[in-house]
């Protein structure tokens, strides 16, 4: 599945993304490691290849989706947005994302989340999408809130960010009915009024 928006393209990750992702991660590690325990100095090509192999396998088995966040005009990969394993029985999933520091604050992540929601709700017909973020991750909380996710509560010390170090998590969710009621407004607000184009594999 590929999803095209106003400025962003979400496309499945593949092994050829490894070198670019290693470069982005290592350039952004100081800003992002507070919120992501796996993100540390000197992420290696081998480690990234292993992640990408797992991601491709999960996508092939329809277990989860891992997308490169790509600038539509320049074709640059600037981050990753993905689902955790999908609960097909209950038609629900949680999502996560990161963007390289050099590209943050420009609305790219917000657009990418909206594009992913379109794919999950309108194409995969899921019922519920959730996201958790540390309570001190101001940028991520702001993105989720302005899109319209519903705040469900705080999970006490549920996010491990370093060995023997945990943080509280804010938990948000959105139902299919809620998304459909705000869908047009989201496109006007974050996609210049254009509807996303979803291409199924």
Language-model regions: role of each:
Residues 26-29, 40, 56:
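Residue-level detector of secondary-structure transition/capping positions
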Residues 53-68:
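A short helix-loop-beta-strand connector motif used in the catalytic cores of GNAT acetyltransferases and
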């Amino acid at each position: 599945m590929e999803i095209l928006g106003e400025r962003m393209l979400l496309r499945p990750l593949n092994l050829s993304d490894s070198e670019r992702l290693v470069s982005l991660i290592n350039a952004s590690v100081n800003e992002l490691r507070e919120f992501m325990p796996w993100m540390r100095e000197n992420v290696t090509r081998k480690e990234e290849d292993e992640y990408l192999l797992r991601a491709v396998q999960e996508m092939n088995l329809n277990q989860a989706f891992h997308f490169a966040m790509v600038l539509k005009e320049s074709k640059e990969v600037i981050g990753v947005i993905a689902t955790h394993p999908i609960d097909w029985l209950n038609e629900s999933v949680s999502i996560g994302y990161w963007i390289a520091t050099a590209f943050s604050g420009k609305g790219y992540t917000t657009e990418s989340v909206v594009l992913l929601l379109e794919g999950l709700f309108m194409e995969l017909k899921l019922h519920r999408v959730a996201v958790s973020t540390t309570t001190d991750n101001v940028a991520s909380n702001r993105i989720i809130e302005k899109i319209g996710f519903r705040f469900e509560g705080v999970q006490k010390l549920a996010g491990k960010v370093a060995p023997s170090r945990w943080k509280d998590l804010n938990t948000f969710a959105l139902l299919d009915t809620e998304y459909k009621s705000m869908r047009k407004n989201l496109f006007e607000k974050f996609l210049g009024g254009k509807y996303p184009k979803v291409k199924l594999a």
